[in-house]
Amino acid sequence: LKQDATLFSPEVIVREVDTVRLMVLDGQGGGIGATLIKGLRASLGLDLEILALGTNSIATSRMMKAGANRGGSGENAIVRTSHGVDVIIGPVSILMANAMMGELTPKMATAVSSSPATKILIPLTQERVRIVGISREPLPHLVNLAVTMVEEIVLEMDKHV
C-alpha cells in the first residue's frame, strides 16, 4: 500500500499501488466524459479504476452510467480528487478558468493544471480558443486516440490494468 497526501487536505488516502487511477472530468451534459469512459472500458476492461468528476450532477450521473467506478460533483470534489490520481482526461477546457459557460471555476482549473497527474486533453472546446497544429476530428476518433494514449501511459507506469 502507498500513502498519497493531497495538497488541499491534511487527510491521507491509502490505496493499492498497482492500480492506475483515471479521473475523467467533464461538465454541462457529460457527453464527452461518458464517451471517453465507454471507450476506456471497451479497451481496458473492468479492472481499471475510473473516477467520474463532473462540474455538475448531471454530467457526473451520465459518466457513472457509462461505467465509472465512482463519481463526484462540484468544485470541492474536483479539487480534492485531482491530486490523488495518475491520469486526468477531459476536454482541453478543463484547464481554462470559467470555461463550460462558467461551470469550471478558477479553483478547478488550477487544481487540474497543478496536479502531478498526466493530462490527456481532447481538443474540443466551445471557448474562444484555437489550438494550432490540431486537425478537426470527430469525437469517436479523438476518443480512440485518447484511449491509445492511456494504454501507453499504463505500460510506461508498469501498473496493473
Please state what every model-predicted region is.
Residues 121-161:
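Short, glycine-/small-residue-rich phosphate/pyrophosphate-handling segment
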Residues 70-108:
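Glycine-rich phosphate-binding loop
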Residues 51, 72, 89, 118-122:
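Hydrophobic/aromatic beta-strand patches that form the interior of the parallel beta-sheet core
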Residues 48-73, 130-132:
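N-terminal beta-loop-helix "entrance" segment that forms/cooperates
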Residues 15, 20-55:
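Glycine-rich phosphate/diphosphate-binding loop of Rossmann-like nucleotide-binding domains
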